[in-house]
């Protein structure tokens, strides 16, 4: 079910205003990837990058083309493990997060 424009705009506004929410997007994206839900993980990272308007900076940090980063996180994108881990490292660093895997 596609998200409405109002919902997306609300999420984007919250990302800009709430550092904890930005961090949770990264954590939830990581959890989605670990649970083999690539589409959700890519969508969450894409939302994070778009809302923070940091895609150009992150691409530069990763030393990849901005267009390649957008493609990687697009619906047909298939990021390599190396690219994905590098992206998580940079995004979590920007938000001052330390990601770690736990078990329940």
Where are these regions (language model features)?
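N-terminal flexible/basic segments that precede or flank functional cores
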Residues: 1-44
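Major-groove DNA-recognition helix of helix-turn-helix-type DNA-binding domains
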Residues: 76
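DNA major-groove recognition helix of helix-turn-helix/homeodomain DNA-binding modules
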Residues: 81-98
């Amino acid at each position: 079910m596609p998200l409405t424009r109002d919902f997306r705009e609300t999420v984007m506004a919250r990302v800009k205003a709430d550092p904890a929410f930005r961090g949770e997007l990264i954590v939830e994206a990581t959890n989605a990837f670990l649970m083999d839900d690539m589409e959700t993980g890519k969508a969450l990272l894409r939302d994070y990058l778009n809302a923070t308007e940091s895609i150009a900076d992150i691409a530069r940090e990763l030393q990849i083309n901005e267009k390649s980063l957008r493609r990687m996180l697009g619906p047909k994108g298939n990021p390599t493990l190396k690219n994905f881990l590098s992206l998580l490292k940079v995004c979590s660093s920007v938000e001052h997060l330390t990601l770690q895997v736990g078990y329940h």
